[in-house]
Amino acid sequence: MTTISDLPEDVVEEILPRVPLTSLSAVRSICKTWNTLSKNRVLCKAAVKKQFLGFIMMDYRVCSMKFHLRNDEGGDLVDDLSIKQVGILDQIEISEVLHCDGLLLFVTKDNSSLVVWNPYLGQTRLIQPSNNFHCSDRYAIGYDNNRNLKILRNFSDYGSSGSNKRGVSFKGNTYILAQGKIRVDSRWKIEAILLSFDFTTERFGPRLQLPFGFYYPQDLFSLSCVREEQLVVLHQSWMVSGELEIWITNKIDPGVVSWTKFLRSISCCRISIQAGSFFINEENQVAVVFDLDEYKGSETCRNQTAYIIGQDEYFKSVNIGEAPNLGRPEKYAPHIYCRPLVCSSYVPSLVPLQINQPDTRKESDD
């Protein structure tokens, strides 16, 4: 009797690339041959190209998120949205998630440790601090010229524009939004800038220009990337209600950057400066921004929401789940809700993690 493990290797290589990334663990358990093939090469490229796959933090839990992006004229741009909690991490409450070249870095909610995870290989690694972690710590992840994974901790002196303080990993370096002062007509003005941290030299590079210049403290800024090929920046002006712009790099080096406008909308709702994580799809000219639903002023229940923004003022909100009510910080203050946080679109990696070995990677402090 022929079994599935008896299939010729060329047939198996036709089957495996069609498997969704989130189903690989089940596929690997079928037989040793399938397990070996899936860990020696990335087999999900076909599926990844046809759908968005990312990871989102909801209710302090890590979830996988996937959906298909469509370009049907007059129809919905997003189809088959699926969000599932990651079983291997269901015992860990997470307050932050960062992505670098197929690896994810999590900060635990109690700030007791960091967790690095390779979703494709199914490997995790716990990192204990050399000094106690603190709730105000900020983190970035990258690698040096020898592909050694490194974590940057505490760069709070480099003030972030707005409240979105997360860095984005791009080709091994980390890029963060920051602010600088410039003198104009005998007055100091605040400008938004981009800084890069080189994990080989362990130094910040020169200031890089953003496409908007001066800004108000209430403006929303957020960084993302496209498969670690291009950086993307989102800006929503506090002064112009509903206006949102997204720019994408057409050139980026350690000392120079140039931008092209990707999308502009005047129909978008106001996104909180405490939220605004997002991703884009170039082929379909669409952006998806994550926040809570619009505040109505009196309700005690709000939903975590994906806002889909497209060409010709296409705008749609999609409810992705009820937001936990975290209570009031003060008696007459409004309720605080847990906001969704998404990392950039995920690309599988064959980089193994050093499991159960002492942590020898350098922890950088500034």
Swiss-Prot record:
PROSITE patterns, A to Z: FBOX
Record domain F-box: where: 1-51
InterPro entries: A_thaliana_F-box, F-box-assoc_dom_typ1, F-box-assoc_interact_dom, F-box-like_dom_sf, F-box_dom
CDD domains referenced in this protein's UniProt entry, alphabetically: F-box_AtFBW1-like (cd22157)
Domain of life: Eukaryota
Protein name: Putative F-box protein At3g13624
Species of origin: Arabidopsis thaliana
Taxonomic lineage of the native organism: Eukaryota, Viridiplantae, Streptophyta, Embryophyta, Tracheophyta
